Amino acid sequence: MKIWENLIEDTKKIIPSDVQCEIKMINSIDSLTRFANSHIHQNVEEEMTDLYLTFHSDGKTTNLNFNITSLGSIDEVVKKALSEIENNPKDSSWSGLASKENSYDGYRNLSPENPDLRAQKVKDFIDQGGSFNGAGYCSSNVSNVFVWNTNGLSSSDTATSAFLDGIFRSETSSGSSHLGHKTLKNIDGEKVGQEAYSIAKESQNPQDIDPGVYEVILGPDAVSTILVFLAVYGFNAKSKVDGTSPIEIDTEQFDKKITLVDDPHKEGALNFKIDASGSPKAQTEIITNGVPKSYFHTRRTSTELNEKNTFHEMFGWGDSFGGLGTNLYLQPGGISKDEMISNVKKGIYINEFWYCRV
């Protein structure tokens, strides 16, 4: 992108030779179609470009964030950063900048998805609901990231995503379903609608159950929620640094059937293939046969824990958040959901957990 190229050229001219600098730019186009009462009522699109700058000099660090519309002169930004550095404390866990050899070229000049296609996906969903009331949204996104630093690294990547999320309601029940993919054309609106309708229909006129011991089967959404919380609060190395993570590497903490990997290169994987340092991501072994194998590391956490960096630094979150795996894959078992249910004598099926917070 021309605006990025010009920014870096201008920055190179004014950065003092004894200052380490890293600049990241995120450009995203978010498109959204919303529906309620089984009718589309909103169609919007928003483009944003944000900049994240890090400066390090004399053992001190400062970070500055700007929206591109409020950037002004890069010369003034550098002056502001150098002034702030003088008043900052020493950064004892500074881990440096990514090397030039880590550069990655993944930028693609892509256009947003057609809103008519989002509308068609919504129609496909609504058509499955019969007399039930439908609501939800269909979204699509194109995001580009660029990373440059004074070590000579120059990286870029492009990621796309599309989601259809909907719910059907009867007088006594509701059923929801959603699906995500890299492109809208791979979203099956009929399938999503059929699943939501089936859940709403089968859960009509619910009855209380007696307290007791029940076998529990978790649906994919419920399992995904558990994995997200494990990733953020367990395998995030920042949680380990802070002493809040329950995860112990190379200690059997899960059932032996549990194997979990983070793989940004798996077919259909969403999100970027570089982390916020500009370095390429790789498949990471998280749990193998019930045994934790790795935390999600950033440059800073790998330095603080003296462990290998796994390159899971998040764009836009800064050092305070830590690392996060964004392409988690749980190794499947050997039987289907229907087979599992048929083997249960007294049990509960949980489709999703509701409103989970920490």
Which stretches of residues belong to each language-model region?
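Acidic low-complexity segments
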Residues: I3-I8, K12, V19-L32, G72-D157, ...
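A generic local secondary-structure boundary/capping motif
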Residues: T11-K12, I40-N43, K123-Q128, T150-T158, ...
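N-terminal alpha-helical targeting/anchoring segments
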Residues: D30-E86
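Extended amphipathic alpha-helical scaffolds
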Residues: T33, Q120-K191, K238-V261, H265
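Residue-level structural signal for beta-strand termini and adjacent loop
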Residues: F66-T69, G180, T298-R300
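Dual-mode signal for accessory low-complexity, basic/Gly-rich regions
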Residues: I249-V358
